[in-house]
Every structure is written in structure tokens, then in C-alpha cells.
Amino acid sequence: MSVSRVSAGAVAITAAAVVGLSGAAPAVAGEQWGINGTFATSSNGEWARINDRYENQPSTRSTWTISTQCISPTECSGTVNSDAGWNAPIYTTNGLWYVKRVVPNWRFCADGTPVEGMQIYKIYPVGFDGHVDLASTEYTGEDVTTGPSGSCGRNQWPAVRMPFYMRPA
């Protein structure tokens, strides 16, 4: 095969690739990887565990307005505004979404001393069958609030875990 035929073939392949790619949309940070909108949330106190022992707790319901920005499917961050009067950062790590906030006066000791809690929501998109579904707009996970070890004279972190669910409002 002559050099001119090889060169002509290479030019034809390059031209076809350029024409084929010219119609493709470039990947941008505007992809719908994040969580944005208004959501109804619920933490189910009927299935709460206090220090890994089931104990009925008050359930909580609220409405969250979430705004996130992403630079990739695994790197997003933003803000959650709750109608309960708080706001907190939201971000992704290893496929899970995290919302972390400090809860002042979370619990009170027998002597009336207030205990601050760290509330962490860990959520992921879930399909109708209960499995992870990245295209879903519904989320499930866990609502965990933990107090400091040694609070109220006990050498143990008080921790309350509740199932969590979130869907578009």
C-alpha cells in the first residue's frame, strides 16, 4: 500500500471523527447529578435505636429546600434549608449524600444541663424495589444524632439512629 493511500485513509478517518463529534454535546457541570428542589422528609421514630437498642422516639417531618452544584457525578456540594429553622451543608462522598449539623440543646441531663448533638443524615437514591437507583428522585438512609461521650456522667456517646426517607414535595 502506498504512502498516499495511507495518508488519504488517515485524513478520511480524522474527518469522519470531527464530523461525528461536532454534534456531540460537551460534558458540563450543569448535568443533573445533584439534588435540587423541595423535598418532604421523614425520620421514623417508631424504628429508632438509642445506643443500638430499639426505643420509640418522636418521628420528625419537615420540608427541605436543597440546592447543589456538581463538577462530577461523585463530587457535589450545596445547602439544605429546612422549614424547621436550620440550614446545613450537603455533599457527596463514596456515593452517599451527607447533611451534617449541630443541634443545640439536643438532650438534657437529669440535672438540667443541656447536651449538644451532632446530627448526620446519610442518604442515597432508592428505587421502588428498595435498591439503589441513581435515576430516582426519592432517597432513603439514616438520621443519626450523637452527643459527646461523658455527657450526663456516662462514659458513652448517646446516639439515636432513625430510618430516613425523602421525596419531592
Predicted regions and their residues:
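Predominantly extracellular/secreted and cell-surface proteins with exposed
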Residues: 57-126
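Internal, hydrophobic beta-strand segments that form the core of beta-sheet-rich folds
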Residues: 117-150
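Edge beta-strand at a domain terminus
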Residues: 140-169
